[in-house]
């Protein structure tokens, strides 16, 4: 087995490569039309030739090495007998066979390098089909093969000398030291010229190439006289005939493409004479010469031929280094794949002159068809001697090149060759001079880049599409268009994308297409047009011509529909409008002067000054507008655009402009200000920076000289009138600073605020653009503009009647049509409002459609449930033996529970504790905690649950702040406040209390709950029974709770959701199960309790529910009929698991901060809630508003801060015993009425159906495992550590999936000793609640900062989210496996769920001990219980 040659390797790879023009084999297919072929003689000849030439049996193995297959695999003659078939059938079969053989790939893996077949035809006619793979048999070898085949056929018994093998020659080549030295010399020669090698010809390659190749040929024959004339001319000019034809081809190709310099692929088949008889070898000897063509260096074709003769000779002299290797070097040099897709193959000066000898013709008939394919070859122009003349045979890839274009090139070449044969002086005629080429300006280059798909919202051309309909004579339209192309250089401007230059062609080319639909009924014809509209509007105009197109659809009765598409590479908006008026109305503006392209004055100083101006001006910009994008802009793909429009009547628009004029505002400023003000309602936060196209006045030829300004609209700055005046100043100032272009601005903004488009909103002023008269015969029907990286282009102009036309072209991938429609409708109302009132002011309440608030309800709709009276009735009705509480082995009936409550009521009264006084409950979960809570609630005593697990310092603050009259403890201890134990309160028997006033609807303070704050201390929320009654009553009714239900209390008792567990269950007369002491965090035990007591209702934060599910084991939880989650993100994956586990259970999402009493919004999770669980709709008597930073109501889909109002509002906060109202504010509702509301730390957005969706949190609040946490609080505490200088705390993970952790980056004080990780973690646990302790602590040299000097939280999240090292995870996993008694021989993954390995809570003590021994970090079993796998344990280890 031997290595492949460079050419063989390239062809082998090209068979499967997915690069351009790949996926074909390099093979040559020929047909010979003969007479009376003797099949047996041919079979014998083929057998003999297979012995002579082993390369017919070439085999390539899986390692890419070549060898020879045994003779058993030699090609066999195939026969197709088509005699007796009808002539049309014969023709069809032959055509199908030609098509199949043209595109086949011979099976070289099994030694099939050639294929032979005979089609037998009537009248003893036959056709010999021969297909050879060029990896084994190059074109020069095909001549040898066919000659030997004919010789063996002609004289079967004549001896034929065996030629040497190709492998012998190839071994000699590889071993020859002189050839190796020559190859290295030539490699260095080519390497020194890599920079100067010309580019590939500019071919109009099809944008979308089919999956399968499609090759076809164009062919003609120059007769013997022409052959003689050309050969005589070549001798006279001292060049070979091949060089003469190469010069003619290069001239024709340059004229067709417009290229002045390009490279051609010129094959050579020279065989190094290293062994005797090399000329008789059949094998692969091909090389490619990369020949440069420079038309600018040749005044005429004769000079071009001389140039090419010298260039080709130089290439030949250095051809020891393979051309395939050279192209590979060129690709590496440029960093992109380099091709030589145009091949020129000449066989005019070979021995014997003719392509095939008379012997071959006599044996098999004349050559009737010849075609080849080759990887990365789009056009192979072959020239050969045949039948005394010259055969011109071009093989073309029609899956890559337009047939019309290549046919035109073919005819151009044939005409030129014929003309030169007839008139030799043609060689001396001057070649057309190259048009002046000018570099593309930055905007044009940006538009070219936008045509690619490598950027978000790319893959589009910046172009304008318009559609007209009416009556117009086609001849008139064609005549006008012809005149316009002649008159306006822009319509002849070509763009060279490879060289980034533009030039004006002398060719008057009408990019006019006509489609005749006159034979169709009108409705059907319009349907055809409708089907073509979108693709036409989005198509990228090819750059092998000026990028514009006019397509005329001819309808019945002389009516026309005209599509027009013009690219901004050559024209700006005003130029387009002007040209279309000229086309359809015949109205000409004064003839613009030709732009000579003279160099402009040096603007270096002006540019520097303008850059400084814009740097200051844009300092306040905080990134792209935060509109309700359907997908993040930096993740958007290729854009497709749609248009929505609005027409404002002339009178309304006139009044509107007059109002603006009284403010000394231009018409465009007035309208732009209203657009920006209205659009700002859809911005969730930050500013609104938009691009405004501008074009300096010019009397030069139509072109695109536009740029754009960046205008920042700050809705918080001053009044609307003041903002509008500032807008006008900004635009006028911007026009004075255009030396710093719009592209410069975009680049500057991208560097500050990328990735993704930074100016996705454009406002285009078309007031100065010409328009057609209202009675035009061709009426504008619509249009579409698209711009790379632009999501919304708001365009305005006035029609001939003075009506305002507003068009919004938007990328539908990132903007919902309903949103655009809402904005357009609001914009129309705003214009009407100003015009009608005559005042330049906007009333947002009258503008924004607030129908999405329709599920809000007034306070009067709140439920007035006497829940406390019902609880008292259940407790104190004699003989009520229904089970009320279960805790471990204890089962308390309602009567027994009532007895305890009665004792505590009596004991409190004995201590003088009554209505309005405060009792702090410092007890673990237990029946006693429940008794004390009920005793206080029933008598009007304000009860305050205190987290007994909180650090001592925090507990001290909680008690000190609420000023308790009594603190009830589990064990006696000394406190600053009066205190007692619960046992003491229960010690004395007492009768059931007498009449208790029903305080269910009392609006006085009923209880306090602590929640996270932003001041470094928890906030004490003051709640009342009236709000609680609404939640209890509404929920019991909605969930249809009865005395048969069983609740399980697992939510911490200082958390608001626990209030429903206690009061909801007991008000319904149901049973409440309490985990026994030590079982609060034992999820395995919870599962047992659910099964043991047939729990029917589960209500908790998502993290607790996930613990239950993770430890489910053999328990099916089948008794649960309703599962409610709230207080944190609900994972869709968990919901999907619940649907599968409990398909009949109701699944409920609950929400609302503690300040709105337990929960104030809910949503029953349905089958459609898969990717995102909605926040829901408010409870009765509540209203949820979404407001922006200015307190304005946000439209549908816009993220704003959530404000709640209504029956569930808390009374305020308790600070040092006094009621405070921070965050309880007054806002205007949708009707403009002032209402008290709570400003939450949450952001959300409404759906059209009135459902609220949660979006994010503000002011440093996050939710972690259901607990609201203030990040600044944690930073404040950690910053007090004496060894730390800076701390930055962030949440990381995926909040929308509920995967949220706290992480802290810290910088140590260089003057202090660096603390250990264990020390920092212990400090955090000592000073922070458990829920606030960071999962991961990471030391850094400096905190990451954004470009504006603020903490870079995004980068912090990246650092904290970095994958843990596998070694740590492996050690953690090994510890768990050891404790569980497993080995890791099977390679258990570190992401495996511990529960699936059999982990149970009793194992965790041993795990914790080993982790401390291994890592020096003390983790409690409770902490480890929440870790599902080794990766999560690794995070705890820091």
UniProtKB/Swiss-Prot annotation:
Disulfide bond is among the record's keywords: no
Keywords, sorted A to Z: Hydrolase, Ligase, Multifunctional enzyme, Repeat, Transferase
Pathway of action: Siderophore biosynthesis; pseudomonine biosynthesis
A GO CC annotation recorded here is: cytoplasm
Q: Where is region (Condensation 2 (Cy2)) located?
A: 460-695
- GO biological process per UniProt: amino acid activation for nonribosomal peptide biosynthetic process; secondary metabolite biosynthetic process
Q: Which Gene3D superfamilies match?
A: 3.30.300.30, Chloramphenicol acetyltransferase-like domain, N-terminal domain of ligase-like, Nonribosomal peptide synthetase, condensation domain
> A Pfam family for this UniProt protein?
Condensation
Residues of the region (Condensation 1 (Cy1)) are 3-427
Question: What start and end residues bound the annotated signal peptide?
Answer: none
Q: Which residues form the Carrier domain?
A: 1363-1438
Q: Does the keyword Repeat apply?
A: yes
* An MF annotation (GO) of this entry: hydrolase activity
What InterPro entries has UniProt attached to this entry? Answer: AA_adenyl_dom, AMP-bd_C, AMP-bd_C_sf, AMP-binding_CS, AMP-dep_synth/lig_dom, ANL_N_sf, CAT-like_dom_sf, Condensatn
Reaction catalysis annotation: holo-[peptidyl-carrier protein] + L-threonine + ATP = L-threonyl-[peptidyl-carrier protein] + AMP + diphosphate; L-threonine + ATP = L-threonyl-5'-AMP + diphosphate; L-threonyl-5'-AMP + holo-[peptidyl-carrier protein] = L-threonyl-[peptidyl-carrier protein] + AMP; salicyl-[ACP] + L-threonyl-[peptidyl-carrier protein] = salicylmethyloxazolinyl-[peptidyl-carrier protein] + holo-[ACP] + H2O + H(+)
The enzyme's E.C. designation: 3.3.2.-, 2.3.1.-, 6.2.1.70
**Highest taxon of the source?**
Bacteria
- Annotated region (Adenylation), positions in chain: 881-1350
Q: Describe its function.
A: Nonribosomal peptide synthetase (NRPS) involved in the biosynthesis of the siderophore pseudomonine. Specifically adenylates L-threonine and loads it onto the peptidyl-carrier protein domain of the PmsG, via a thioester linkage to the phosphopanthetheine moiety. Activates proteinogenic L-Thr preferentially over L-allo-Thr or D-Thr. Then, the Cy2 condensation domain transfers a salicylic acyl group from PmsE to the L-threonyl moiety attached to PmsG, and the Cy1 condensation domain performs a cyclodehydration on the product, forming a salicylmethyloxazolinyl-PmsG intermediate.
By its UniProt entry, which PANTHER family does this protein fall under?
NONRIBOSOMAL PEPTIDE SYNTHETASE, PYOCHELIN SYNTHASE PCHF
Family as reported in the entry's similarity comment: Belongs to the ATP-dependent AMP-binding enzyme family.
- Per its record, how is this protein called by name? Pseudomonine synthase PmsD
Recorded name of the encoding gene: pmsD
